[in-house]
A protein has these predicted regions:
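Extended, low-polarity transmembrane helix blocks
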Residues: 1-67, 71-94, 101-165
Length: 165
């Protein structure tokens, strides 16, 4: 990035890198905003154990839900419905904030894809989940570029600048 800060003309490669960093950074932030929204909606709706139990009961009666998820729902989610109900909204909000800030972006994209897989397995589909899945893949594909505009990079740049100055 320091090469881009000099007075020399940008090369085609510099322009491509800059464009990719803007694109994949926007993908990361967009995914973060969607997760932030998901968590916010659940917080406002007072999401809790009753919602988790609704998913568990729905999974046992729904032929579209895979057998492995029915097993997980009955033996893991049902006994921990209180904890899962409490933790789901803050998990989604935290995931959104971490992606927006660009902290642990690769891990966050994997967690995002994993949560979406769990939601899909339970047949809890909403319109933005396919978009969120594509954005999760986008963060993973562009991981070398998506963090150029992150809080961690800005902190590193600032400390490097202070050391030089």
């Amino acid at each position: 990035m320091s090469d881009l800060m000099t007075t020399r003309a940008l090369t085609t490669r510099d322009r491509a890198d800059l464009a990719a960093s803007i694109l994949f950074g926007a993908v990361r932030v967009g995914l973060g905003l969607l997760w932030l929204h998901e968590g916010y909606v659940k917080l406002r709706a007072h999401f809790g154990s009753a919602d988790i139990l609704l998913v568990v009961d729905g999974a046992s009666a729904n032929s579209r839900v895979p057998e492995y998820f029915r097993f997980v729902a009955e033996h893991l989610l049902r006994p921990t419905a209180d904890l899962a109900g409490i933790m789901t909204p803050p998990t989604e909000v935290t995931l959104g904030l971490v992606l927006i800030l660009g902290v642990f972006s690769t891990l966050s994209a994997v967690v995002s894809a994993g949560l979406l897989a769990v939601y899909w397995s339970s047949d809890q589909l909403i319109a933005q989940y396919p978009i969120m899945a594509l954005l999760s893949v986008g963060v993973l594909v562009g991981q070398g570029y998506s963090n150029r505009w992150s809080i961690m990079t800005l902190v590193r740049r600032r400390s490097t600048h202070q050391e030089e100055g």
